[in-house]
Design a protein with these regions (language model features):
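Glyoxalase I/VOC metalloenzyme domain signal
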Residues: 2-41, 45-188
Length: 188
């Protein structure tokens, strides 16, 4: 299968990767977040139009396999396992999250967030994630924190999220990897 960066339908997100990598690294620095020892298991996109999501899907189907397709928070989300990774900082992501547009509008179409796995009790996720971030970083103008518990129709694992954003890119923390969540769906 082809490398994702050579697929015509994915040309815009290939070109967007350096911007995302720079913005993510800058956000981590602002937050005092040492990303080196952390396991990030997937990367996610955002788009404004269904036609963009459909084009990206066609592209990912040429360079990976569909792991999961689910309705989460009222919109379709596909997960693809790529044959060649998306490289950001020291990470090599083989899983890409492709959500269709929802009610929220994002400032940029392209790469939007990474998801870091902090194994442990779901009830302690927020405290464990916040302990990795510098207080002075969290107090900076433009930094926002959000907690949520997104859930797919057949998911069996509680999957709370703590997200930290600067409005451009986001770092999300979860207690489970996305592949563990997908496996829990098959137990339904």
């Amino acid at each position: 299968m082809a490398d994702w960066q050579t697929i015509d339908e994915l040309h815009d997100i290939s070109a967007d990767l350096p911007r995302f990598t720079k913005a993510l690294t800058e956000l981590a620095t602002r937050l005092g977040l040492d990303i080196a020892p952390l396991e990030a298991d997937h990367i996610s996109l955002r788009c404004h139009q269904n036609t963009t999501a459909e084009r990206w899907r066609r592209g990912f189907e040429q360079c990976g396999t569909l792991l999961s397709e689910n309705i989460i928070n009222g919109r379709p989300i596909c997960l693809f396992k790529l044959h060649q990774p998306v490289k950001v900082a020291h990470w090599s992501f083989t899983v890409v999250e492709l959500p269709w547009p929802g009610e929220k509008r994002y400032p940029h179409e392209g790469w939007e967030h990474i998801e870091i796995v902090l194994p442990g009790e779901p009830e302690t996720l927020n405290a464990r994630a916040l302990a990795l971030l510098a207080d002075e970083g969290l107090r900076q103008s433009g930094i926002a924190i959000k907690t949520s518990s997104p859930k797919g129709e057949h998911e069996r694992l509680p999957n709370p999220t703590l997200a930290v954003t600067d409005g451009t890119v986001t770092v999300k923390f979860h207690p489970w990897s996305i592949e563990e969540i997908v496996a829990s769906e098959s137990d339904a």
